[in-house]
């Protein structure tokens, strides 16, 4: 049984979340709190397994509460966020600070539409309940030398690709935002390949993730746009709620976004992206599967290896928040290498040099 502390300043939301969670026989609500200060006291008294934490609260907000939880005695936390730009930005910061995942309120802070995310909330709490946090959670630090970077809007200037070039593709889910912050900042701005990323995330949050990663990294990171021409040293993150494919048109890699449902229940889907890349035989692919629940990416990796040459790196169990997606790739015998998240960027660069040799 997973014991949950529900933290929200709205009595309506506390009751609603409690009702949703207790509809699952594996979850019990140990208690509730109206703000962060009260939550910290309840944590000491109740010792819950998981916390659902609202972001916007009086007395002590969710972000400050999360900082204190992670600095003292870390517990798995699922943030509950509003679908606003400010809410999205703060949510990404909370994932950076150590929150396991988040659930978006569909229509603001008080909404009957929360029923739409009931199953997602239950799933994420169950997942969080299986996570064992490893000691004090240290926030991701900025690079020692950093130039001011603005959020990227609009397409990049296209660069015509030569035969035999390389591309990098990354798939991740739960724990992915924090993992990406431990990989992308280590890639050089002179990177001789584009990077395509699928991070399972709902609409409205991937732009904030891209902006944050862009701020931390030497490479340029942006949310992908339909029809955009890809460029070396640029990182393209699939928008939440859309699938991303990459094709070749007149010597240029072109991104296509669409709303079609696929065999994967995820949108964006790692399998969908990787399968589109499989047809690009002119390119050496370096595929990376990192932390996440389930097996999205496994079929896509099979396609990459079946239709062309490629190298597959899977994140090791020791650094994965949820060892699901990488485990599936490893168990299917598809991984060329298994790396701790802090070693993945170096592995990517090593394989790029090998494949160019």
UniProtKB/Swiss-Prot annotation:
Record keywords: Phosphoprotein included? yes
What reaction does this enzyme carry out catalytically?
Answer: [protein]-L-glutamate 5-O-methyl ester + H2O = L-glutamyl-[protein] + methanol + H(+); L-glutaminyl-[protein] + H2O = L-glutamyl-[protein] + NH4(+)
Q: What is its EC number?
A: 3.1.1.61, 3.5.1.44
Cite a single GO MF annotation. Answer: protein-glutamate methylesterase activity
Q: Which UniProt keywords apply?
A: Chemotaxis, Cytoplasm, Hydrolase, Phosphoprotein
Residue ranges constituting the Response regulatory domain according to the UniProt record: 3-120
SUPFAM superfamilies xref list: CheY-like (SSF52172), Methylesterase CheB, C-terminal domain (SSF52738)
Q: What class of enzyme is it?
A: hydrolase
- Mainly resides where? cytoplasm
Record-level GO BP terms:
chemotaxis
Show the GO cellular component annotation of the record: cytoplasm
Instruction: Give the matching Pfam families.
Output: CheB_methylest, Response_reg
> Mind telling me how this protein is modified after translation?
Phosphorylated by CheA. Phosphorylation of the N-terminal regulatory domain activates the methylesterase activity.
Q: Which SMART domains match?
A: REC
The UniProt record lists the CheB-type methylesterase domain at 161-355
Q: Does the keyword Plastid apply?
A: no
Q: Which residues carry this modification: 4-aspartylphosphate?
A: 54
Check the record and name the CDD domains matching this protein. Answer: CheB_Rec (cd16432), REC_CheB-like (cd17541)
Q: Which HAMAP family match?
A: CheB_chemtxs
Q: Which family does it belong to?
A: Belongs to the CheB family.
| NCBIfam families, per database record | PRK00742.1
Protein function: Involved in chemotaxis. Part of a chemotaxis signal transduction system that modulates chemotaxis in response to various stimuli. Catalyzes the demethylation of specific methylglutamate residues introduced into the chemoreceptors (methyl-accepting chemotaxis proteins or MCP) by CheR. Also mediates the irreversible deamidation of specific glutamine residues to glutamic acid.
Q: What's the entry's take on its domains?
A: Contains a C-terminal catalytic domain, and an N-terminal region which modulates catalytic activity.
Q: What is this protein called?
A: Protein-glutamate methylesterase/protein-glutamine glutaminase
Q: Which organism is it from?
A: Bacillus licheniformis (strain ATCC 14580 / DSM 13 / JCM 2505 / CCUG 7422 / NBRC 12200 / NCIMB 9375 / NCTC 10341 / NRRL NRS-1264 / Gibson 46)
Gene (UniProt): cheB
């Amino acid at each position: 049984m997973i014991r949950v502390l529900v933290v929200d300043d709205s009595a309506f939301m506390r009751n609603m979340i409690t009702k949703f969670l207790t509809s699952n026989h594996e979850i019990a609500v140990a208690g509730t709190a109206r703000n962060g200060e009260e939550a910290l006291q309840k944590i000491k008294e109740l010792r819950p397994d998981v916390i659902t934490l609202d972001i916007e609260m009086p007395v002590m907000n969710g972000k400050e509460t999360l900082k204190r939880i992670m600095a003292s005695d870390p517990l798995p936390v699922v943030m509950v966020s509003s679908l606003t730009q400010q809410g999205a930005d703060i949510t990404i910061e909370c994932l950076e600070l150590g929150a396991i995942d988040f659930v978006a309120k569909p229509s603001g802070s008080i909404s009957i539409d929360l029923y739409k995310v009931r199953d997602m909330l239950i799933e994420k709490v169950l997942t969080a309940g299986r996570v064992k946090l490893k000691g004090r959670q240290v926030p991701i630090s900025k690079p020692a030398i950093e130039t001011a970077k603005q959020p990227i809007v609009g397409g990049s200037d296209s660069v015509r690709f030569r035969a035999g070039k390389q591309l990098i593709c990354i798939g991740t889910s739960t724990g992915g935002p924090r993992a990406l912050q431990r990989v992308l900042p280590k890639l050089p701005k002179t990177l001789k390949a584009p990077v395509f990323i699928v991070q399972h995330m709902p609409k409205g949050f991937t732009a904030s993730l891209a902006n944050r990663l862009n701020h931390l990294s030497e490479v340029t990171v942006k949310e992908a746009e339909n029809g955009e021409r890809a460029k070396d040293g640029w990182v393209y993150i699939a928008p939440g709620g859309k699938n991303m494919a990459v094709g070749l048109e007149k010597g240029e890699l072109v991104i296509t976004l669409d709303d079609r449902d696929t065999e994967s229940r995820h949108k964006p889907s790692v399998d969908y992206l990787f399968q589109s890349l499989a047809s690009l035989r002119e390119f050496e692919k370096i595929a990376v599967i990192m932390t996440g629940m389930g097996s999205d990416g496994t079929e896509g990796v099979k396609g990459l290896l079946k239709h062309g040459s490629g190298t597959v790196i899977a994140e090791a169990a020791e650094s994965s928040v949820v060892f699901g997606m990488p485990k599936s790739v490893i168990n299917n015998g598809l991984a060329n290498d298994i790396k701790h998240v802090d070693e993945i960027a170096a592995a990517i660069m090593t394989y790029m040099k090998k494949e160019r040799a």
